[in-house]
């Protein structure tokens, strides 16, 4: 059953490529490169990840290719996560239009936090210290908590219909995402506390270990459709 679910991700390749094509040809996209470029990167990398998914912890893949490697995926994801969170914060500042100074200032915390989360994720991979995944994911809770709170703060402003719709979408997304992320953080905590291998891991900045894990992130992978290798159901 899980095998079909993973293979079904390929549908996402088609939908994302269609969205990319529509964005570039049909939709009346903005000329603002700070909006357009992050959006194109996000859609393109989303299509790539649907075709070459990988689980960072188990290094499980569905296509045995270097393109499925943890390193390649994480490198692309680092770029896309920083750029699209910048885009989110940029949109908040556009909507705010200098009305609330605290919105402009706090929106930059989203960008700072996503950069911090990247360090935790790369630390988990290159130092083989999987506890860092918790702090990476906690960072995402912080990011979208800020996004939601700032959106609520701006809902009473005199906004255009388009901007008001974006604010509502932000709030609804936050209302759905934040409780789910709390459950996700609890599942990560449970995995850390019940997995003897993770509990045995030590924080070690040894350069030889970093080199070894770097090579492992490129070369090591296993084709698996076992739900346990993908974080379970």
Q: Positions of the model-derived regions?
A:
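First transmembrane helix
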Residues: 2-29
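Lipid-exposed faces of alpha-helical membrane segments in multi-pass integral membrane proteins
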Residues: 37-48, 79-82, 109-116, 142, ...
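Short aromatic-rich membrane-water interface segments that cap or initiate transmembrane helices
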Residues: 66-79, 228
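Eukaryote-biased recognition of C-terminal alpha-helical segments
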Residues: 128-140
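Membrane-interfacial loop-to-transmembrane alpha-helix junctions, especially the N-terminal start
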Residues: 29-41, 98-111, 161-169
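Helix-loop junctions on the outward
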Residues: 44-72
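Internal transmembrane alpha-helix with an interfacial aromatic "cap," most often the third helix
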Residues: 21-27, 48-57, 76-107, 115-125, ...
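C-terminal transmembrane-bundle signature of multipass membrane proteins
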Residues: 11-21, 148-233
């Amino acid at each position: 059953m899980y095998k079909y679910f993973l293979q079904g991700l390929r549908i996402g390749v088609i939908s994302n490529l269609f969205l990319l094509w529509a964005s570039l040809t049909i939709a009346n996209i903005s000329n603002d490169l700070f909006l357009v470029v992050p959006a194109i990167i996000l859609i393109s990398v989303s299509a790539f990840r649907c075709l070459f998914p990988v689980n960072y912890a188990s290094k499980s893949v569905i296509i045995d290719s270097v393109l499925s490697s943890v390193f390649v995926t994480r490198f692309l994801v680092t770029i896309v996560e920083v750029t699209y969170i910048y885009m989110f914060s940029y949109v908040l500042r556009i909507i705010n239009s200098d009305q609330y100074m605290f919105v402009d200032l706090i929106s930059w915390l989203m960008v700072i936090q996503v950069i911090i989360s990247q360090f935790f994720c790369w630390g988990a991979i290159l130092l083989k210290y999987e506890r860092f995944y918790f702090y990476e994911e906690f960072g995402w809770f912080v990011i979208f908590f800020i996004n939601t709170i700032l959106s609520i703060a701006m809902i009473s402003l005199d906004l255009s219909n388009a901007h008001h719709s974006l604010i509502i979408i932000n709030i609804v997304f936050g209302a759905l995402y934040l409780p789910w992320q709390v459950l996700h953080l609890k599942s990560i905590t449970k995995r850390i506390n019940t997995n003897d291998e993770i509990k045995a891991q030590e924080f070690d900045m040894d350069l030889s270990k970093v080199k070894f894990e770097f090579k492992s992130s490129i070369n090591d992978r296993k084709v698996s459709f076992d739900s346990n290798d993908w974080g379970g159901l």
